[in-house]
């Protein structure tokens, strides 16, 4: 009886493709297609109902003549410049504290990470609004120490401060990244520095910071991207006011898309935001790259 041998080579050839096909399909449907569609819609006059009408770069030209766009761009830049450095500093300080070998430190790490999980959901927003009302806990504390109550929602700086405070409260993600990096620093470095007479501050600036350079850069990029896309907090807490002082680009995109049904313009603004954020990230890469070459 003649034996039949099956050659598995043909099957093995397509096995890998079969396993990665769900990822490829998902990428094409949920990443590449929306990406290309958004770019094309940004060059049309489209209200979401009638067929889009190609207008070329008219949306981009009118964008830079739009006072709302210029204001939202300024607010987003101002917000990012204030928030990102503060969040990095607070996250690093908390990571240094939580890196200490103290009993129950695991519980403290969990507690400080919880705000990042909660984010800016409705319950957190209500709590935040209660804290900063005219007779809220924050103003009561300020009156107690003799500073006096502040009209947080009635002035531009106060409203932006509320948004910044809310996002600073969510320092847990950056803190965890710093904490993991701190635990990777060999303790022998600190022992050698101590033998050489280097104190804690000396060890921090000569060992800890240089060893955290890449992680600081990573957190800087992540926090910058997040800040440039800000929408939830100002939308739910201040509504962009007062006087559009918290009206970010994210809110402008939302209003143009769902309030004014100007989908073409909204997609164009989103692409400008994408390009600006990408340029900032590339500049940071260039700066850190040249800095490393200089150190070498």
What are these regions (language model features)?
Residues 4, 8-296:
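A structural signal for multi-pass alpha-helical bundles of membrane permease subunits
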């Amino acid at each position: 009886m003649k034996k039949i041998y099956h050659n598995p080579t043909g099957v093995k050839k397509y096995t890998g493709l079969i396993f990665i096909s769900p990822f490829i399909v998902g990428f094409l449907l949920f990443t590449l297609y929306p990406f290309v569609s958004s770019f094309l819609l940004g060059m049309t006059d489209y209200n979401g109902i009638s067929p889009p009408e190609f207008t070329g770069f008219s949306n981009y030209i009118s964008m830079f003549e739009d006072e709302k766009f210029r204001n939202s761009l300024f607010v987003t830049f101002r917000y990012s410049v204030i928030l990102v450095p503060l969040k990095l500093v607070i996250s690093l300080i908390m990571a240094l504290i939580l890196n200490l070998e103290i009993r129950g430190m695991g519980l403290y790490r969990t507690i400080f990470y919880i705000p990042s999980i909660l984010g800016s959901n409705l319950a957190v927003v209500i709590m935040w609004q209660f804290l900063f009302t005219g007779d809220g806990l924050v103003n009561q504390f300020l009156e107690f120490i003799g500073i006096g109550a502040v009209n947080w929602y009635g002035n531009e700086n106060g409203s932006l401060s509320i948004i910044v405070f809310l996002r600073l409260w969510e320092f847990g993600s950056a803190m965890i990244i710093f904490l993991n990096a701190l635990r990777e620093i060999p303790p022998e470095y600190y022992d050698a520095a101590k033998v050489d007479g280097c104190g804690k501050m000396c060890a921090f600036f000569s060992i800890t910071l240089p060893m955290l350079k890449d992680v600081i850069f990573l957190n800087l990029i992540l926090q910058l991207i997040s800040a440039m896309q800000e929408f939830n907090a100002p939308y739910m807490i201040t509504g962009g006011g007062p006087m559009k002082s918290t009206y970010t680009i994210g809110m402008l995109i939302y209003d143009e898309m769902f309030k004014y049904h100007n989908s073409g313009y909204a997609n164009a603004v989103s692409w400008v935001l994408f390009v600006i954020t990408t340029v900032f990230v590339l500049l940071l890469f260039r700066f850190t790259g040249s800095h490393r070459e200089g150190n070498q």
